[in-house]
Structure formats: C-alpha cells, structure tokens
Amino acid sequence: MNASEHIVDAYFRLVRGCFTLADKKVIKGNNRQLDVLAYHLKSREAFHIEVGVTHQQNWCLSIEELAPHFDKKFFGTSPERKGAVDGMTDFEKGKSYWSKITETYENVGFNPEEVIRVWVTWIVRGVDGRSPINVEFYSNHLNRTFPIQILSLRDYVLPQLQNEIGTANYDDELLRVLGFVKQRELQSAMIS
C-alpha cells in the first residue's frame, strides 16, 4: 500500500467508520488488485476504492479524462495498447476482467450489484473538490451505467481526516505525521 492509499484507507476507517481491506488481489487477475475495499457494518455499504493521486496540478485530469481509468480499475477493461507481436496484449485479445472483479467482490462477501465505487484523486481539474463529486459513468463494454463518487484527496479527504485524527495514533506513522502537521498549523495560527 502506497502513502496515498494508506491515507484513503485511514479516511474510510476513521472518518466513515468502515472496516477496510487493502490491496486485495483480483482472483485470476493477472497482476490486478483492488486498492481498498471497505465495509460499513451499520449501513451495510460496501465500497471499492481506487486511488490515482499525483500532486502536480498539471497532471490532474478532468472528469471526462478519468473515464478510461474508471473502465480499467472498476470494470476490468484492458488499456488500449499494441504489443510487439500483433494480438498479444489483453486489449488486442479483447480480454476483460469484469467477471474476475465481481468474483473478488463475492469472495469477500460483497454483492457486486451494490458495491459503491469511489475514485480518489488529488484534484479534479475544473471542479470544486471540497465535497464528493457524484457522476454517472457509462461503461461501453458492459453496456450500462454505474454511479461513481470522486473524492479530492487535497480538498476533501485530507481535511476530513485531519479533523478526525487528533493527536494520538502513535502506532500509525502516517497518521501521527498528519497529526503533527495539524498541530503545527493550529499553533502557528495562534502565534501569528
């Protein structure tokens, strides 16, 4: 789990009150994994969260530019590319991992039809990210529409998590650092 996935995992645990499972391998998925799966016991909501974060603003995508990433990560399409030998890439073979993704959901007890898909990115170009962004995504290869929630790590997840963590979390280095940063900001504001 990389740092941004760790932050998102902590957000779903501490802010949303979910149990989480990170880096779940897709069953027979040829090096595919689901970044974070989360489950909220009271509401019985099941989440599949994918994290695509870069903090350089010029690399941040618009909602339209995120579509191929949704199709690959949530719905198992293979990215369009050509192999050195014609017909050898998953794309050229027309391979889809959708059935393996749904099998993986079922393997952890999720109903594939009820999974809430969440994409986390640094920011979405051209959109205010201070609250969740809900979009309807049409998957061409599945011929249906799915709701996807997009969260800005910079504008939504980090502030929510910093408000929740306080100054404890001694066993989690990443959360401890976020706690230090929050306290620095609070104490610096008092001095100014």
What do these predicted ranges mean?
Residues 1-34, 38-192:
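Intrinsically disordered, low-complexity Ser/Thr/Pro/Gly-rich regulatory segments
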